[in-house]
């Protein structure tokens, strides 16, 4: 059996694709990847040999364009969807699994035009424009935030390194692989207070601020674990007792899998303010704290960190993320829809 995996643009989307690929391989399902020349798709998968084939199309987004730009992008997407139908025929694709993002549009529309089963995974609490449009036509729509709960695919390494936290000895600041300037500045401003409490610092600061952050810690004589990017983030999280982080869905569920308590500072310019609502999913269960970027007072923030009941939160986080989520999604998608797949 061969399926197409499509979507991407951001690391969060692409991490789900990778989980689904690994799950498909375990089930002896071959995968063709259809992404975009833009975004991070090529950087992630251009050299991924486990795909049967990879296609990086000239797809582009429709959001934030003027009227004529939207029309032009839609026409271009329809043209690319025709190319995807040829890919489906050539590789005998039997189903399409989309993780969203504009790079998923051509293959998703092609699935509908070709009468192939279309499965969609929405990663955020607020659906993206493409997923909202296609949801009524999808064979199955998966979301970890909806009442009909579906697991969020997270790499097993985050589960394998999980532990119950009891005391704040180490803190990790997660600005993402691209860095988050606000979180970087917050970490540097908190550093003297953390040193006074003998709390060790782990700091993912991104490439742009790496030298600046490293020099700042050195000037304070603080032995911080500063890095721009790590392929072994699960191990870094394992060493931490609390995370200060943005609230992208992948990061949020990786923290849950690792049972690592967090204070979230949602990116204020995220589409539909989805990072805030991602974090609110946990806050409503008393499993995190949220500070908006424009309301942070350094002293209040530091006090909130020290007051968290880490053991209680860490213990209850075990019930949020589900191991082998990719396996479960594929099982739900394919086993219940065999009538569609010939």
Swiss-Prot record:
GO molecular function annotation: UDP-N-acetyl-D-glucosamine:N-acetylmuramoyl-L-alanyl-D-glutamyl-meso-2,6-diaminopimelyl-D-alanyl-D-alanine-diphosphoundecaprenol 4-beta-N-acetylglucosaminlytransferase activity; undecaprenyldiphospho-muramoylpentapeptide beta-N-acetylglucosaminyltransferase activity
Catalytic class of the enzyme: transferase
Pfam families registered for this protein in UniProt: Glyco_tran_28_C, Glyco_transf_28
Superkingdom classification of source: Bacteria
Compartments reported by the entry: Cell inner membrane
Protein's UniProt keywords contain rRNA-binding: no
Binding residues for UDP-N-acetyl-alpha-D-glucosamine: 10-12, 124, 177, 275
NCBIfam families tied to this protein: murG
Record family assignment: Belongs to the glycosyltransferase 28 family. MurG subfamily.
Descriptive protein name: UDP-N-acetylglucosamine--N-acetylmuramyl-(pentapeptide) pyrophosphoryl-undecaprenol N-acetylglucosamine transferase
Source taxonomy: Bacteria, Pseudomonadati, Campylobacterota, Epsilonproteobacteria, Campylobacterales
């Amino acid at each position: 059996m061969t399926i197409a995996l499509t979507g991407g643009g951001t690391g969060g989307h692409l991490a789900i694709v990778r989980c689904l690929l690994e799950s498909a391989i375990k089930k002896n399902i071959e995968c063709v990847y259809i992404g975009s020349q833009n975004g991070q798709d090529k950087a992630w998968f251009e050299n991924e040999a486990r795909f049967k084939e990879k296609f990086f199309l000239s797809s582009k987004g429709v959001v934030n364009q003027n009227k004529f730009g939207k029309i032009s992008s839609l026409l271009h997407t329809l043209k690319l969807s025709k190319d995807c139908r040829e890919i489906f025929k050539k590789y005998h694709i039997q189903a399409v699994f989309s993780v969203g993002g504009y790079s998923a549009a051509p293959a998703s529309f092609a699935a509908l035009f070709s009468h192939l089963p279309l499965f969609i995974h929405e990663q955020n609490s607020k659906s993206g424009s493409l997923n909202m449009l296609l949801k009524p036509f999808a064979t199955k729509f998966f979301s970890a935030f909806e009442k009909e709960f579906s697991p969020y695919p997270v790499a097993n390494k985050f589960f394998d390194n999980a532990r119950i936290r009891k005391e704040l000895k180490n803190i990790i600041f997660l600005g993402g692989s691209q860095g988050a300037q606000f979180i970087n500045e917050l970490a540097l401003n908190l550093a003297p207070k953390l040193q006074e409490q003998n709390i060790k610092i782990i700091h993912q600061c991104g490439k742009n601020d790496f030298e600046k952050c490293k020099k700042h810690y050195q000037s304070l004589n603080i032995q911080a674990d500063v890095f721009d990017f790590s392929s072994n983030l699960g191990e870094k999280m394992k060493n931490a007792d609390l995370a200060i982080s943005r609230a992208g869905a992948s990061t949020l569920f990786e923290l849950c899998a690792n049972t690592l308590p967090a204070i979230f500072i949602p990116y204020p310019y995220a589409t539909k303010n989805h990072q805030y609502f991602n974090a609110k999913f946990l806050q409503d269960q008393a499993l995190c704290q949220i500070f908006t970027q424009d309301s942070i007072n350094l002293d209040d923030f530091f006090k909130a960190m020290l007051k968290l009941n880490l053991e209680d939160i860490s213990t209850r986080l075990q019930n949020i993320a589900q191991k082998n989520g990719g396996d479960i999604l594929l099982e739900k998608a394919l086993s219940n829809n065999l009538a569609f797949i010939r």
